UniProtKB/Swiss-Prot annotation:
Protein name: Uncharacterized transporter Mb2703
Membership in a protein family: Belongs to the CitM (TC 2.A.11) transporter family.
Topology with respect to the bilayer: Multi-pass membrane protein
Keyword Transport among record annotations: yes
Lipid biosynthesis as UniProt keyword: no
Regions crossing the membrane: 26-46, 51-71, 99-119, 135-155, 173-193, 223-243, 278-298, 311-331, 361-381, 407-427
Family annotation (InterPro entries): Arsenical_pump_ArsB (IPR000802), Cit_transptr-like_dom (IPR004680), Diverse_Ion_Transporter (IPR051475)
GO cellular component entries: plasma membrane
Location, primary (coarse class): membrane
Keywords in alphabetical order: Cell membrane, Membrane, Transmembrane, Transmembrane helix, Transport
GO molecular function, one term: arsenite transmembrane transporter activity
Lineage of source species: Bacteria, Bacillati, Actinomycetota, Actinomycetes, Mycobacteriales
Subcellular location, record wording: Cell membrane
Length: 429
């Protein structure tokens, strides 16, 4: 059955990577195939932690999507972008830096796709007022979103998958990855002038930007206060997980439920933000990966990787980091991480007696998150941004994105390698 499981998975992966077929349909078709043949049973799918659907991931995404959907109704994201542009006093470079920081922070608290969807429209507005090219700003923002998303458990879907499989908490991500993300963001800001060159703007255009009223962006102040209160409670519960022992997925669902009750929005308004295609895609993917786990394919790969690295935790971590970045750049990092987590879990189990056994998990998360910047299809946020740019009449080619993204990815992965080496293999010994 292992040959059947591998054949179905590889075929589905190729179709997903081609971006020519609906990826949700492919994932669900592949899932149906491994069930019908049958490689995996319904009990494995719904109840097994190792081979089934990861319900923690699904419900965390549902909860956060609803929370973000309600928050979107307030106009707070548009307010923040306009505020940043005015504080920069019309300077293109300063505007870019502030929007990069806003994008990174928003991605850490929400997710990078949502951040791009919310920040990009205002970026287009500001660039139109300044009469400057939007492509540089949009690319800088999506780079920052993918980097910032690495900082927290909820910032990027790959992190959610890693956390669920490895048993890592919101605090673990804050403690281990946020310091590196800050360093990488500083490096990104430092290379922005070299990446995009000098951008000039006329004085009267600056006056137009300064005339924008960010206060008008807020559409519902009462709802904004309610959202703020619920978000404080949600993130407090994330941070208090070691004490409360409440799963992040349950916290997100409770927060979403509270906002549904207090917001007064209709069902269509708060459910419209739930990306059902994404959730079904995850479910299908988990089932196909579960088939690989059940048939022993993942176990065999883990043992082969252990032999390649001699079972050394340092070599294993750097192998995962080095492989994850380019692969995540070629294909979407979500299916890649869903495939790799059982493999890394097996590797960690084999090397359980060594110190710093969480390091391969951090290497996987960083490689996937930062590698998403490599090409235009490396992360879902990139695809969304390209669509926005195309509709705005400023299309970005695959290779234009890749030339810039390759530089950002190389710098990010180099800093990640140094960080992992120093923090987990030098300073701890």
């Amino acid at each position: 059955m292992s040959v059947v499981a591998v054949t179905i998975f590889v075929a589905a992966y190729v179709l997903i990577a081609s971006d020519r077929v609906n990826k949700t349909m492919v994932a669900l078709t592949g899932a149906a195939a491994v069930v019908v043949l049958p490689v995996i049973t319904s009990h494995d799918i719904f109840y097994s932690h190792d081979t089934g659907i990861d319900w923690d991931v699904i419900f965390l995404l549902v909860g956060m999507m609803i929370i973000v959907g309600v928050l979107r109704q307030t106009g707070v994201f548009e307010y923040t972008a306009i505020w940043a542009a005015k504080r920069a006093r019309g300077s293109p470079l300063r505007i870019m830096i502030l929007l990069v920081l806003v994008s990174a922070l928003a991605s850490a608290l929400l997710d990078n796709v949502t951040t791009v969807l919310l920040i990009a429209p205002v970026t287009l507005l500001v660039c139109d007022r300044l009469n400057i090219n939007t492509t540089s700003f949009l690319m800088a923002e999506v780079f920052a979103s993918n980097i910032g998303g690495a900082a927290t458990l909820v910032g990027d879907p790959p992190n959610i998958i890693v956390a669920s499989r490895a048993g890592l908490t919101f605090n673990d991500f804050m403690l281990h990855l946020t310091p590196l993300v800050v360093i990488v963001l500083i490096a990104l800001i430092a290379v922005l002038p070299r990446l995009f060159g000098s951008i000039t703007v006329e004085a009267d255009r600056i006056a137009d930007v300064m005339a924008l009223d960010e206060g008008e962006a807020i559409r519902d102040r009462g709802l904004l206060v309610k959202c703020g209160a619920v978000l404080v409670l949600v993130f407090a519960a994330f941070v208090a997980h070691p004490v409360l022992h409440i799963q992040p997925s349950l916290v997100a669902l409770l927060g979403a439920g509270m906002l549904i009750v207090v917001s007064g929005l209709t069902r269509s308004e708060y459910l419209s933000s739930v990306e059902w295609d994404t959730l079904l895609f995850f479910a299908g993917l988990f089932i196909m990966v579960g088939a690989l786990v059940k048939t022993g394919v993942v176990n065999d790969l883990a043992r082969a990787a252990t032999q390649l690295t001699g079972g050394n935790i340092v070599a294993t971590a750097f192998l995962i980091l080095g492989v994850s970045a380019p692969i995540s750049g070629i294909i979407d990092n979500i299916p890649y991480v869903a495939t790799m987590t059982p493999l890394v879990a097996e590797l960690v189990a084999v090397m359980g007696g060594q110190p710093s056994t969480d390091t391969p998990w951090w290497a996987l998360a960083l490689g996937a998150d930062f590698g998403g910047n490599l090409t235009a299809i490396g992360a879902s946020a990139n695809v969304v941004m390209l669509g926005i740019a195309r509709r705005a009449g400023a299309p970005i080619s695959f290779w234009e994105f890749t030339r810039k993204g390759a530089v950002v990815t190389a710098v990010s992965i180099a800093l990640a390698a140094i960080y992992l080496w120093l923090r987990y293999f030098v300073l701890l010994h």
